[in-house]
Each structure stands twice: as structure tokens, then as C-alpha cells.
Amino acid sequence: MLQTSSSSATASLQQQLSKQYANSFSNDGSSFSSKNNQQYSEIVNYISFNQDASCITIGLKNGYKIFNCQPNFGRSFQFKNDESTGIVEMLYCTSLLATVAQGEEIGSSPRKLKIINTKTKSTICDLIFPSTILQVKLTNTRLIVVLEDQIYLYDITTMKLLHTIETSPNLSGLSAISYDDSNSYLAYPSPPKTITHDSLLASGINTNGGSNSTQNNISSVSNTPNRVGDVIIFNLTSLQPISVIEAHKSTIASMAFSNNGLYLATASDKGTIVRIFEVATGTKLYQFRRGTYPTKIYSLRFSADDKYVLATSSSLTVHIFRLGEEEALETKHKKKKIPAVATILEEETEGSQSNEQTKSIKRNSEEFEDIRDDGDDSDVDDEDGDIDDESLEVIPAKQRKLSQGSTNSYTSVNSEDVQSNSPKTEPLIDQNRLSMARIIRRSSQTLGRKAAQKMGDFLPSRFSSILEPTRNFASLKINAHSKDTKSVAVMNNVLQQDLIPQTYLASDNASAKQDFMEVSLFHIYVVTTEGMLYTYGLDPERGGDCILLNSHCILDEY
């Protein structure tokens, strides 16, 4: 809830925040200048957060850097040399570090993994692999090295090779690791071929991952040829595959485990749908629509409390999806009520199928094609990029139906109680993003949404969920110079008191009684390949547009 602050003790802080806020959106002489961003984007090879999101690692053309980002921002380690670093990964906040060179210089190789002690600045060991190292992950017990067609598993305490997994070509080295000691898993894309009964039984894999899975479950996979969107779950403790999750029908682009290792988030190369599965059973718990137009998902990450999922994309936005009771009920409602043809159509928005299936879908669901395109111009080439359909016009909470509340995802899980005590339940709106393109698009989308709601009152319930897809709870726009900027994001679960300018939210500046407001926010940290660290604030009760709190150029000398 927003509160105004008039204490004289905060005057200096307010002045500092005002200056910082103004600089954040300046195009001249600030850390966001085009010249600086172009320069930094050319030297950043790799960006990553460590396992608990307390540190940032940056791979550079001339070495690497490590920064603390929680509780306070600051550089903790820097190594400079003439070798370009392609991968740099930490083991939590310990002195153990894994690095891989780009191989651009004479004598360096992208096939060599170095395990380094940052305290002594010494190399513990070197490991040479048969092909280029694409990804490296560290847990308390395992070292995982991903190549294009192999995954190597080591005991991190002895550096002994425990197991080697032969995989289908994995050009990006896509994988996900669960860091929980009780649920230590590895996820990687399944081979894009028909899986037979014999191969499943021989390797101990079943489609549901449960001990009571039936032969019908296996045949459901084996009867689906050339699947490329399946994910294999591998137990890092027993060194055995335990299940196959049918995540998408097109190629997997990104995935991430929850912090407790119980859930897996996935997105395909289409970039329109984000799904959350239960690892133990393979059951789909949540399904969110990020947008209608295709985009590249760079990363998925659960919040520290596993109640939110963050998705960064090539549209320079970060979407935050809430894993609440309403969203779970909405996904369950869709699963039960949507007819088979609609389910197929939902899958078809992500990938392509055979000509026969495509023709069948067009014949049976032609009338639904327009309403399935829900109007999220998330990747339209304008300055605003992704927006929420309802972010600028909100229906009073008491008039919302369950499906609509889940669709907008703007109320808290216990929204009824919160709304009864506070009139300010509408989502936050960033006045700085109110461009003409966004206003026009909002008008057309709101009209479409109202029409869908009216139609939903007259149509059977199985069609209403088609008209109202589950959307993100909040989003933010990255103020990047280049459209090719990549980003990763994390979110903590500690509410912090922040002062933000009243003009950030007030549409009428004259009506603002105070210059600043005190807001309770979750902090979201976003690192980009332009060498910037952004801190945004998320209102957990209202959602909507996240608030830019501060920024740091992490490549500047200190």
C-alpha cells in the first residue's frame, strides 16, 4: 500500500532519489548513454547470478568480474588478463570458481575448464573435453559440464567423473539444475525422435515419473513421433533418469527448477507460453501466456520463495508470473473445460505439426483462430514493447470473476481480504511508459477484452477460458540501447521500504501533495549484456508496472 512521506529527515534522500530518477531516463551524459552501452555490449560475453542470487558473475573480453548484489551492491573480485572469458560460474559465495575461455586467443581453448580458488588466485585443476564446453553448473556435490552431445557429471569434492550422459545435439547447451540437496535434479532436452516402449523401460524412464505409472502413459509418448519439446529429469544423487515431461511441441528454449526442486518452468522457442510442472509427477500446474507474437526467451528463474517466475526475453521486457491459488485454479479449469480441438490449437501457437494435423485443426477450429489471438502486441517494434492488456484500465475487484482475476493476475492470492481493507488494488502504472502507441494499443485491447467478457457470459464455460488467457502479474521494460541486449533477472522475497517519486504514478502532477511516496516492494535485479544492473520494485498486492529504483554500470572502475 502506498503512503506519503513528509518527514524532513528524508529531504536529502528525496533530493538524491530525484536526481537518480531523472538520470535514469536521460539520454545525455548518464550511465544510459548510447556510447557507453555500445562499448560495453561489445566486451560482455557472459552474465549470470549464482545459486542464491547474492552475486553476479560477468565474463569479459579481458577476464571476469564478480559483484555482490545483496544486501548491498559492490565488486568483490576481479581478474584481468588477455584471455576472453566465455563462461564463469560460482559455487554460492565460496572462493570456488569455474571458468571457460572463448578460445579467441592463441593458446586458449573453449574445451578447457578451469577450477579456480579466488582467495589464493590459483588453479585447482584443468579439465579438457572432446568438444566445446557450452554450459557449466556447480552444486554442493556435483560439477555438471554440458557439451553439444554429452553431459559430464563429477563429484565436486574429489573431481572424480561419476557419469556421462549421451544426448541429442544440444547446440545451446540448454540444461537446468536443482540446487536443493534433497531434490537434486538435472533437466535437459529429450532426443527429438520417437521413444519406444523398450527404450523407456530399459532406461527406467516413464512419462509421469511416479511409481504407479501405467503402460498407457508410456504409449502416449511413443505414439507421438518426432517430439522435440520433451524434457528428461535426471536424479543427480542416484545418477538415474526418473521421468520425461511432455513440456511443449516445439523446441525447448529455456527452463529452470524451483529453489526447492519440486517444480520446473519451461518455455519453447516460440516464446509465447510459459508452463510450470510438478517434477515428481510431470503434472502441469500452471500455464501462462507471455504474449501472442514469437520472441526469444533468454532466461527463466523462480523467485527466492518460489511464488513467482521471471522470464526475460528479446523484447527487452521481464515478465513476472505469480504462482498463486487463483492461477492454479484457472489452469485446472482450462484443462478440464477446453475441448480437445482447442487444446490442440493452444499447442499449435507454439510449434508446427504435420500437414494432416494442421489441416484438421484449421477445419475444426477455424472459428476460434481470431479469439485465440489475444492481442498482446508484446513484440511490436515500438518503444514500449510488452504491455499488459489490462495494465491501464482496471475493472473494480468486486466485479471480477475468478477467471478474470486469474487472467489479469493483479490481485494477491488472498485478494478478497486485501481488497476489503484497501481501495488501492488496481495495478501500478508507469506514467513514463504512456506513449501514444501504448495508449492506442491499450484502447483496442480493452475493447477486445470487454467483448470477450460479454461473449463469455453467453457461451459455455469451456469457451470462456479460450477468450481469457492467464497473463503475467507484473512486467518491466529494460531501458537498453540495443535490441540485441540479453538479460537475466532474479527476485528476492523480502519486502523493503522504498521512496519513489509521486510523479512516477500520478497522472496529474498538480494533484500530488507530496514529492515522494513510501512503498513496500520486492526487489528485482536485472543484469544486461550492456553492463548494467537495474533494480526494480514490485508491489506484491497490485502488480502492474515495476518501478525502476536504481541502476549501476557494473563495468565502470571503482
UniProtKB/Swiss-Prot annotation:
One of its GO terms (biological process) is nucleophagy. It is a peripheral membrane protein. It is found in: Preautophagosomal structure membrane; Vacuole membrane; Endosome membrane. It comes from the Eukaryota. Belongs to the WD repeat PROPPIN family. The PI(3,5)P2 regulatory complex regulates both the synthesis and turnover of phosphatidylinositol 3,5-bisphosphate (PtdIns(3,5)P2). Necessary for proper vacuole morphology. Plays an important role in osmotically-induced vacuole fragmentation. Required for cytoplasm to vacuole transport (Cvt) vesicle formation, pexophagy and starvation-induced autophagy. Involved in correct ATG9 trafficking to the pre-autophagosomal structure. Might also be involved in premeiotic DNA replication. This is Autophagy-related protein 18. It comes from Candida albicans (strain SC5314 / ATCC MYA-2876) (Yeast). The gene is ATG18.
